[in-house]
Swiss-Prot record:
Matches recorded under CDD domains: AAK_G5K_ProB
Catalytic reaction equation(s): L-glutamate + ATP = L-glutamyl 5-phosphate + ADP
Documented EC number(s): 2.7.2.11
Function summary: Catalyzes the transfer of a phosphate group to glutamate to form L-glutamate 5-phosphate.
Chain segments annotated as coiled-coil in the UniProt record: none
Stated name of the protein: Glutamate 5-kinase
Binding-site positions, substrate: 57, 144, 160
Chief place where the protein resides: cytoplasm
UniProt xrefs under InterPro entries: AceGlu_kinase-like_sf, Asp/Glu/Uridylate_kinase, G5K_ProB, Glu/AcGlu_kinase, Glu_5kinase, Glu_5kinase/COase_Synthase, Glutamate_5-kinase_CS
Annotated Pfam families: AA_kinase
GO molecular-function term, one example from the UniProt record: glutamate 5-kinase activity
Gene that this sequence comes from: proB
Gene Ontology terms: cellular component: cytosol
Highest taxon listed in the record's lineage: Bacteria
C-alpha cells in the first residue's frame, strides 16, 4: 500500500496544543521567543481565514517563575494557588504578544464535568462558536484551581493532551496539532534505541503501538507518549485527525499545513466500498 499523502487544503478549524516544556525554559524562565513565534504563526493562519483554538499548559510553570519558587509544591492547595497566579500571568503575556499581531485572545478554563453535563457542554460549545465567529483565538486550559481528582467527583481531564482532544471534539475541529518535545511517534523508545524509526502515518492504533508508547516513569509515561496515543484514539472516535510534532520551531506548523511530512499524522483510512 502506497503512502497516503497529507491533504490539509480543506482544513479550516485547527486546535493547537502546547505544553509546559515548550513554554518554560529548563531554567524555569518563560520562553518568550517560543510564545512570540506561536502567536505569529496563529495570527498568520487567522489572516488566511483559518480558525484556531490554542490549548495551553503552563500555569504552574508561570506561577513558579513569578513566585520565585524553585520547585513545584507537593501540597495540593499550594499547587492550586501557584497555578492560579500563573494562569493570569500566562494569559497576560499571551494577550500582549498576540496584540503585536493584531489578534485578540480569550480565556476558557474547563473542568471535565463541564463537558459531561449536556447543558454546560452546549453552553461552552456556543461560547467557542461565538468567539471564533468574532475572529478571536480562544486559549483553553484546565481550571487547576478548582479541578479535583477524587473517585467520587473526578473533574480533571488527566492532562492537556486529553483536554486538547476533547476540545477538538467539542468544536468539530478539522485537525488537532499537538506540539511536543519529541519529533512524533517512534516504533520504539528513541531515548533507548538508536535505530528507532519515526512513524509518518498511523491509521490504526494497535496494541503494539500502545505498548511501544512505554510505561510510566519516563517522559514517554504519564503525560508522555501514552496520553498522546489516548488522545489520538479520542480524535479517531470523533472522526478527526491529528499531527504529533516537535514544537521546537512553531513555524513548522505552517510547513505541516502545506503537507510536508513532519511529525506523525494520525488519520484513519476511509473505507472504500465496492458495489
Amino acid at each position: 500500500m502506497g503512502m497516503m499523502k497529507r491533504q490539509f487544503e480543506d482544513v479550516t478549524r485547527i486546535v493547537i496544543k502546547i505544553g509546559t516544556s515548550s513554554l518554560v525554559l529548563p531554567t524555569g524562565k518563560i520562553n518568550l521567543e517560543k510564545i512570540d513565534q506561536l502567536a505569529f504563526v496563529i495570527s498568520s493562519l487567522m489572516n488566511k481565514g483559518k480558525e484556531v483554538i490554542l490549548v495551553s499548559s503552563g500555569a504552574m510553570g508561570f506561577g513558579l517563575d513569578i513566585l520565585k519558587m524553585e520547585k513545584r509544591p507537593t501540597n495540593l492547595a499550594k499547587q492550586q494557588a501557584v497555578s492560579s497566579v500563573g494562569q493570569v500571568a500566562m494569559m497576560s503575556l499571551y494577550s500582549q504578544i498576540f496584540a503585536h499581531y493584531q489578534t485578540n485572545v480569550s480565556q476558557i478554563l474547563l473542568t471535565r464535568d463541564v463537558v459531561v453535563f449536556p447543558e454546560s457542554l452546549a453552553n461552552v460549545t456556543n461560547a467557542f462558536e461565538s468567539l471564533i465567529s468574532l475572529g478571536i483565538v480562544p486559549i483553553v486550559n484546565e481550571n487547576d484551581a478548582v479541578s479535583v481528582d477524587e473517585m467520587d467527583h473526578a473533574t480533571k481531564f488527566g492532562d492537556n493532551d486529553r483536554l486538547s482532544a476533547v476540545v477538538a471534539g467539542i468544536t468539530k475541529a478539522d485537525l488537532l496539532i499537538m506540539l511536543s518535545d519529541i519529533d512524533g511517534l517512534f516504533d520504539k523508545n528513541p531515548t533507548i534505541y538508536e535505530d528507532a524509526q519515526l512513524r509518518s502515518h498511523v491509521a490504526v492504533i494497535t496494541q503494539e503501538i500502545i505498548a511501544s508508547a512505554g510505561g510510566a516513569g519516563s517522559k514517554f509515561g504519564t503525560g508522555g507518549m501514552l496520553s498522546k496515543i489516548q488522545s489520538a484514539q479520542m480524535v479517531f472516535e470523533n472522526k478527526g485527525q491529528m499531527v504529533l510534532m516537535n514544537g521546537a520551531n512553531p513555524r513548522d506548523i505552517l510547513r505541516v499545513l502545506e503537507g510536508q511530512p513532519l511529525g506523525t499524522w494520525f488519520k484513519q483510512i476511509e473505507e472504500v466500498t465496492h458495489d
